[in-house]
């Protein structure tokens, strides 16, 4: 697979991603699979700028750390929508069973669009024998985010929403912004998502505005408001 060969990984790591790819191919529908690979590809693009290209001047230890962060990001991207292969009742049951390990309320579990992340992390962990907390956290919160997100989780949150298969009014501008300033892009993508939810008359995740305030606290000064 060309997309695997393009990843900045060791041969052993590429083989691991290749194995994940073969397994998800068996269970994802064509739309889910295309979105997964497109999300991974956009993660690769952003990671090159914000993870891999940042490491050479920081010493060998930090280069190794950056490569490890990047590998975990690739795994999370491959599995971020694993929960979508299950029906909502199953997802809700798994999420409710594990609610003590989620930053959510029982009411949040009535929001269908976030269940696949919350429950999918536990299901992917079990199915693919993934015990790494950072990978599972990336999967768990890729739809909603959390306060003080890591660079990898900023990347997967953004990539999921602006990968090349997405088509909505602001997406081209957001892609351009993502290559220039990841933090300002996070602010704009999060804002765009809140506006979409409100305009759709849908319930909002209980932590949304705390997360929004946290993003604004650090990055709000970077923005001049809406760009036309």
What residue spans do the PLM features occupy?
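Divalent metal-dependent catalytic cores for phosphoryl transfer on phosphate-bearing substrates
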Residues: 24-26, 68-188
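Charged phosphate-binding loop/patch that engages nucleotide di/tri-phosphates or the phosphate backbone
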Residues: 195-228
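Glycine-centered secondary-structure boundary/capping sites
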Residues: 28-32, 99, 181, 201, ...
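Short coil/turn segments at secondary-structure boundaries
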Residues: 36, 171, 205-209
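Acidic/His-rich, divalent-metal-binding segments that scaffold phosphate/diphosphate chemistry
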Residues: 1-104
């Amino acid at each position: 697979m060309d997309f695997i060969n393009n990843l900045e990984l060791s041969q052993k790591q590429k083989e691991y991603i290749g194995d994940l790819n073969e397994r998800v191919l068996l269970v994802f529908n064509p739309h889910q699979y295309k979105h997964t690979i497109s999300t991974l590809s956009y993660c690769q693009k952003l990671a090159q700028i914000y993870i891999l290209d940042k490491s050479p001047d920081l010493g060998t230890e930090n280069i190794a750390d950056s490569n490890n962060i990047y590998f975990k990001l690739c795994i999370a991207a491959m599995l971020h929508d694993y929960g979508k292969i299950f029906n909502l009742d199953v997802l809700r049951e798994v999420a409710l069973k594990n609610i003590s390990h989620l930053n959510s309320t029982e009411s949040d579990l009535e929001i269908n669009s976030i269940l696949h992340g919350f429950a999918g992390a536990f299901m992917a962990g079990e199915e693919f024998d993934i015990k790494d907390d950072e990978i599972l956290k990336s999967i768990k919160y890729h739809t909603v985010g959390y306060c003080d997100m890591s660079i990898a989780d900023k990347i997967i949150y953004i990539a999921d929403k602006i990968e090349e298969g997405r088509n909505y009014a602001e997406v081209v501008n957001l892609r351009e912004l993502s290559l220039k300033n990841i933090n300002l892009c996070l602010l704009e993508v999060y804002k765009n998502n809140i506006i979409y939810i409100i305009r759709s008359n849908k319930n909002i995740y209980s932590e949304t505005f705390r997360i929004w305030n946290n993003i604004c606290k650090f990055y709000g000064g970077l923005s001049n408001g809406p760009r036309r």
